[in-house]
Amino acid sequence: MTGTRREGLVYGLGALHAAARGDRMMWALHRAALSNGIVPVIPAVAVAEGYRTEARSDRIGELLAGTEVEPFAGEAARRAGEIAARCDTSDLSVVAVVEVAERRNCAVVAQRQTVLRTAAALVGHELVLYAV
């Protein structure tokens, strides 16, 4: 671990699920980020997957009110697709999280640790991960 300072946070699908189930640590982390001027980022593809798979969409909406939703288009979508092919996964929401974290130099709040670490290693990004 080189101790590289991260510029922000990227939320993955696991962060949305944790927020939807009312996870206190997730909400505390989110409030702390906002109170310190950090606006977490979440890829649009992870937002879509969150609404597809989570019954408590009201809580997802609450969380999203304090985040920046990163569009999943153009160059970012191309890079995510290439990373997904290289790490042999069809989970674009996870790979999009790594793509955003690498490009923006962010730490990650997510759940799928194995895929995240594999994808991060492929792009040469030292992953700082808070697992929810």
Residue ranges and their predicted role:
Residues 1-4, 98, 102-132:
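Acidic, PIN/NYN-like endoribonuclease modules and their adjacent C-terminal/linker elements
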Residues 1-41, 51-62, 122-132:
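Short, well-structured N-terminal submotif of metal-dependent ribonuclease cores
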Residues 15-16, 46, 76, 96-97, ...:
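Alpha-helix capping/helix-boundary segments
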Residues 36-39, 66-68, 102-107:
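Short active-site oxyanion
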Residues 40, 90-93:
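Short, structured loop/turn "capping" segments at alpha-beta junctions
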Residues 48-49, 75-80, 132:
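A short acidic, often aromatic-flanked loop/helix-cap motif at beta-alpha or helix-coil junctions
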Residues 67-88, 99:
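Acidic catalytic patch
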Residues 71, 92, 109-111:
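Short beta-strand scaffold positions
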